Amino acid sequence: MHLATLNVRNTADRWMERRSLLARQLVDLAPDVMGVQELRMFPDQAGWIVREVERRSQGRLRYRVHRRAKTGPAGLWEGIAVLSRLPVVTTAWLDLGAQARVAQRITVRLPGGGLFDVYNAHLGLGGEVLRSGQAQRILAWMVARPPLPAVLLGDLNTRPGSPTVELLSRSLRSAHLHVHGCEPLRTAPTPLRRHATGDGSVLDYVFVNDLLDVDDAGIAFVDADPDDPGLIASDHYGLSVTVTPRPTAD
């Protein structure tokens, strides 16, 4: 099972120029399921992405989009989505209770017939108290589910070692940390944010539960335009993770 996540920066920061970079790298990556955050709801940004990916792949990659807008008026502008090439059995969403943020869950059917839960989230800006509260809501939501292999992915707006990451790590594992012994050097900002200062931060994660083995993990969507080093798919790098469900006792 190959998963990816990317904050796509809605249609800001040279979207019309960078969108082909995003689509090309998505074709090359070809995840089974991908979470996206900061998605423009109107016009339909996700719709353009999946149509362009299908065109570039000559029909080989066909994704269905499962969108969830932010709550309230903010939902007219922005939301999150999961793109899936696998059959989706059910979908659900969760109000995270602050800054109009939401999380979503899609349950996919694996080629072998098993079910797999994918949680996609974009946690709020501001303090760790806010984000820890949102993370706790997601964890409680996950615990209420039947025991299925599950991942939580997205832009969590928090750094390694933060209270939010520590909370999540009590019951989940960071895929990148598990494979490499550390998180990436950074996931944001990329060269697209030309005026950003500092060394950047890790804000994006893929967490897995104990019913999954992590086979590989790394950053993704790193390629810049060969003629313009400041033009890149987004202001975040993405993550790419390959996992295998652990055998279960009959």
Regions found by a protein language model. Give the residues of each.
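Membrane-interface helix-coil boundary segments and nearby low-complexity
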Residues: 1-5, 12, 215, 248-250
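Charged helix-capping and loop-helix junction motifs
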Residues: 19-20, 131-139
